[in-house]
Amino acid sequence: MAAQTAATTTRESLGSLILMIYTFTSVVDADTFASGLGSNVKGFWANSESAETAGDEGVNVTNSAGTFTLNLKTTGAVTLYVLATI
């Protein structure tokens, strides 16, 4: 497990919410990312962007006070989407 830094960050306005899009170039299972959003997070999901082996697809993400843990079976690029209020 290691702390990740986003390669790119995009911020989009969605009315009363913002959509933060974080792109990571190489994530290993159980890596973490501290977004700094704290309890402002309202929803989140992630997509794996690498060519994955059948049976190893997908990424699971959990949130604890704005720190996200990314769990996946293979190492690869991941995009994290976070809906938040600021």
Model-identified regions with their sequence ranges:
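Extracellular attachment/recognition segments
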Residues: A2-I86
